[in-house]
Amino acid sequence: MAFVNTLLRTIRCSAVHTLVQEGRSLSLLKASHQLTQSRKIMLSNHVRKEEAKSEPNETLDLEEWKSILKSDIGNAEMVKTETQEDSSLNEMQELVEMWRLAGRAVPQSITTEQLQVLMELPTKTARKKYLKYLSVREVMKTNRKEKKKELKESKSKIESLDQLETKEDTPEKKNTFLLHVWDKSIDTMQRWKCVQAMKFGQPLVFDMVYEKNMSRYELENTVCQLMESEGWNRRSTDPFHIYFCSLQPYSMYHKELVKRYIGAWDNVFVTATDKSHVEMFPKEQLVYLTADSPNELKHFDHTKIYIIGSLVDRCQQTGLSLANAKRLNLATARLPLDRYLKWDVGAKNLTLDQMIRILLCLKDTGDWKKALSFVPNRKHDGFAEPAASKKRNIKNDGGMEYAASTKRNLQKNSKMYKFGASKSFIKPERTDDTSIRSTRKRWWEEEN
């Protein structure tokens, strides 16, 4: 076998040299090279085991090939967009530094999120105003920190002086059978209630589909109200099982919640899901609470699942939540503010923490007056009597007044038609006036 291979090699080399000397074409050389390279000499009748195994025909999966190409293109586009964003952020950072050197109102430190907001602003004046707002907020924050430090120092000084004065007069500590309740034990009790509510409690849904209808400032305000709502629910005696429905991962809502909770977002006893409330619960049990609804909520139903729209609309987008509920064919209701309150000024939209406090009070007591006491006093002029009780009072009082007035009229008529009954209705008999006239003095008569 080795001998044959060496022989072929020598023949090929000699043929190449002769062709080169005679000036043959390169195509012939290439063809001869391919032919000699692909030749296989079998000196035995037996076939090798490796070649005997028939290899399966490998078919090319076009879908997989397309997906790989698309993923490569998508990754390239993502890299391009990331580089573009980084370059634009660097440009905005340089612009802020230039304005700071020029002596304009610019914050000393600015985050990437604030730079992104600055990039989204369309005009130069809007960017100037936003930077001025950030600088003012930074100054206020530093002033607050300094005041807190001063208060702490003054408190520590006062406490040290008090300790020195009262060190001699301190009485001996007495034993007591009452145990001290620590803040940690209260916190664990509240968390245990939330765990029980997640298993057995009534659900309460916060609809998180209004991210596109709000500005960044309104979204931050909404997240603050959601955190307050979760706190009030945790501290209540019978908490709700709170659902954050349609909360997309890595959305502005999600990022702001993770940022505000400072690492404690995973430990909050709230069910956060990207599914809609229609997918989570049956439609028959859902009631969407909105101020634009024509239906009034007369009593709290413990079998229903109430939905609150997570929306802070400074520009008063009326009918947004009602349109969303109608699109999904859901029942709607509004709080009976006109029936129980003398509404004075302002819209009837309440904040999220006020809504959950009203619902918690209704769930515990069922008293509308207690529940609506959480409505701000600046919006109404006190409580009014319910319409049903007013009608009842009008019926009762009106009937009594009507009976009294008819009795009075009958007495008057009887006196009028009774002969000699009253001097006011029947004229008295005429008497002789001569004696009276004689006693009167005349103006022309002289006095004796």
From Swiss-Prot:
GO molecular function, one term: tRNA (adenine(9)-N1)-methyltransferase activity
Transit peptide: 1-48
One Gene Ontology term from the biological process aspect of the record: mitochondrial tRNA 5'-end processing
Annotated region (Disordered), positions in chain: 144-167, 429-448
Pfam family, one: tRNA_m1G_MT
Domain of life: Eukaryota
Record field: catalytic activity: adenosine(9) in tRNA + S-adenosyl-L-methionine = N(1)-methyladenosine(9) in tRNA + S-adenosyl-L-homocysteine + H(+); guanosine(9) in tRNA + S-adenosyl-L-methionine = N(1)-methylguanosine(9) in tRNA + S-adenosyl-L-homocysteine + H(+); an adenosine in mRNA + S-adenosyl-L-methionine = an N(1)-methyladenosine in mRNA + S-adenosyl-L-homocysteine + H(+)
Matching PROSITE patterns: SAM_MT_TRM10
Subcellular location field: Mitochondrion matrix, Mitochondrion nucleoid
Coiled-coil regions listed: 137-165
EC number of the protein: 2.1.1.-, 2.1.1.218, 2.1.1.221
PANTHER family: TRNA (GUANINE-9-) METHYLTRANSFERASE, TRNA METHYLTRANSFERASE 10 HOMOLOG C
Subunit note: Component of mitochondrial ribonuclease P. Interacts with HSD17B10/MRPP2.
Chain's role: Mitochondrial tRNA N(1)-methyltransferase involved in mitochondrial tRNA maturation. Component of mitochondrial ribonuclease P, which cleaves tRNA molecules in their 5'-ends. Together with hsd17b10/mrpp2, forms a subcomplex of the mitochondrial ribonuclease P, named MRPP1-MRPP2 subcomplex, which displays functions that are independent of the ribonuclease P activity. The MRPP1-MRPP2 subcomplex catalyzes the formation of N(1)-methylguanine and N(1)-methyladenine at position 9 (m1G9 and m1A9, respectively) in tRNAs; trmt10c/mrpp1 acting as the catalytic N(1)-methyltransferase subunit.
Protein name: tRNA methyltransferase 10 homolog C
Lineage per the UniProt record: Eukaryota, Metazoa, Chordata, Craniata, Vertebrata
